[in-house]
Curated annotation (Swiss-Prot):
UniProt record, GO biological process: budding cell apical bud growth; establishment or maintenance of actin cytoskeleton polarity; filamentous growth; regulation of fungal-type cell wall organization; regulation of protein secretion; septum digestion after cytokinesis
Biased composition annotated in UniProt, kind: Polar residues: 62-78, 130-150, 180-195
Chemical reaction(s) catalysed: L-seryl-[protein] + ATP = O-phospho-L-seryl-[protein] + ADP + H(+); L-threonyl-[protein] + ATP = O-phospho-L-threonyl-[protein] + ADP + H(+)
Protein name: Serine/threonine-protein kinase CBK1
Keyword tags: ATP-binding, Kinase, Nucleotide-binding, Phosphoprotein, Serine/threonine-protein kinase, Transferase
Binding site for ATP: I321, G322, K323, G324, A325, F326, G327, E328, V329, K344
Gene name per UniProt: CBK1
A family per Pfam: Pkinase
Family classification: Belongs to the protein kinase superfamily. STE Ser/Thr protein kinase family. COT1 subfamily.
Top-level division of the source organism's lineage: Eukaryota
Listed Low complexity bias regions: 22-54, 196-212
Amino acid sequence: MNYDYLTDEQKQQLYFHQMQAEQQQHQQQLHYKQQQHIQQQQQHQQNQQNQQQQPQPPRQPFSTFLQNNGSNSDLPQMGTFQQDLQRQNIPNLRFSQQNQPSDLGQEFQDDDSFMDEDLTEIHEQPPMQELNSSPMTHPHSFQQNFQTPTKNDDANLRNQQFQSVDSERSLDFKPPVTFTKLNNNSNADLSSPTESSFLKSNLNLPNSNIPPAGASNDPNAQKSNYIYFNRQPNSLNKIAQDKASSIKLKLENYYQMSVAHAIERNQRRLDLEHKLLNEESGSSEERKNRQLQNLGKKESQFLRLRRTKLSLEDFNTVKVIGKGAFGEVRLVQKRDTGKIYAMKTLLKSEMYKKDQLAHVKAERDVLAGSDSPWVVSLYYSFQDAQYLYLIMEFLPGGDLMTMLIRWQIFTEDITRFYMAECVLAIEAIHKLGFIHRDIKPDNILIDIRGHIKLSDFGLSTGFHKTHDSNYYKKLLEKENPHHTNPQNGNLQAPSMATNNRNSMMVDAIHLTMSNRQQMQTWRKSRRLMAYSTVGTPDYIAPEIFVHQGYGQECDWWSLGAIMFECLIGWPPFCSETPHETYRKILNWQETLQIPDDIHLSPESEDLIRKLLTNAENRLGRYNGADELKSHPFFRGVDWDTIRKVDAPFIPKLRSITDTRFFPTDELENVPDSPALSKAMEQRDQVLQNGGNVKEDLPFIGYTYSRFDYLTRKNAL
């Protein structure tokens, strides 16, 4: 019977009925076995009573037996006969003599012919000599001999005296100290210095803190028979500690990934079954079964392809389309398939120095956990000794900053379109449980159809332990203590500048709100800031600067700042220096002003002011994106089909590698980072020497492969 199309309630009822039937069947079998056992016991007792009632014939001495059989042997020859029996390897002869029932032993205590009777039985049935005969040839004889040991045997065991099979002499056997049982029933005095040192040397327990004899003040206190010791991994060398930490993290990551993959696999199966149940009744059973079989083939294919290891040698670099302080973004083409990707490379050493370990892990988790059309798709991630690599989809339309530089100001209709799509994109990030914290025009990319997608989640957080910098500081305390102490100069202390990735200053621009030409110069300088770690604090919420508690509402502040720039032409808190920008953002009540020569609709101005306000009163704090969707500024927006409509700007490409919407010409004026050049030289040396790629502790588990992309035809 096919149970795939039953409801969960029907499956549960069917499962309960089956369990009840199995329990009833088990009880019947148990009752039958009990009745059979009782009958066997009654039959056995009846047989014993019948044997006791039958009269036993009188026993004859062995000498009479020999005379009746016409034998001339006499009793002194029995010593030789006994030696012959021993040479015939009769097993457990002496033990069988001791293993007689106690009542028979009492009957023949005063009868000298008891030994003769035993030998009579042996003489009547002499043993047959067999090749390779041994006591283990017939194990059932051992079972019969050892099933009912006598009291004498117990006494012998307590005295630790064992009889030899091949000789008549006994051996006094005492177990050595290493056989002493370390449990509650042990009589070993572990407080003894001799036994303590012996156990420590044999059990390899360094620095055991066994309490010495007489250490307790209470004379009536019972001595402990346990070994107490402290783990001291610091006594091991540095290499051993690093290997232990690496193995521990790899094991944790292995089981975490195994459980996560199993949950995802089961969820994909449930989603497909739910989809098939909701289809029209016209779908045939054969078609549904075929789809389930196809899913099984995809799962099997994914397990194989996921083990395929990628490296930098699998891609050809077409052009560098972005640079930053921690790496660069390249347009690459896969050698075997010819497909185009955007490869983001991050330098590991800079991740250490700039305290970006938590940020890069959060970015990878966001991209890997999202299948939303509003987020850039991550296909693969891998690493080598110097770099982390993110293989993402290539969006040829550039970013929103390029559009602002080209068009300067958007109309309200165009602004409404892009802001509505940004609302849906931010909502998708929040549903994943993440906060972006760095939404700006540079991170809003344009796809081939003109719609937006969010990227660059380097400052995002999901409030997981691996997204917290303190987690990596504790992890690296023993590996590189000088990397984790902000006071020694090797790692910059967290500050506004480092948190916003500021490292290269540009010329200050004396800004006047009426000078559009100078504003355009600021935009070009702003692009240079985007390539470096100078960053732009213009879009960051004030609660992030003051290290107060904040939530998802900080992303809505950034959206308000972007909307201000689209309608007016510059950010709301634009200043000559970043520090002046910080000051204006913190004092937003006084510095937020809309120029008099800019005419905005009441709806747009109201939305800007409700987004650029304190966190308690900010729009979207309590009900998220629904509060923004219901604002009058977005009246008429079809939120369900907005991605299907034509965008205001659709990039027209000349080829699949066309990058004219990226300011690649400006990248020639951006100097390469010395750290990047040094890392590339080190990587080339490692490859020439044939060195193995080594995973660092913070980057264990960084590798990723996407299911829906990897299971496509010719994905790899």
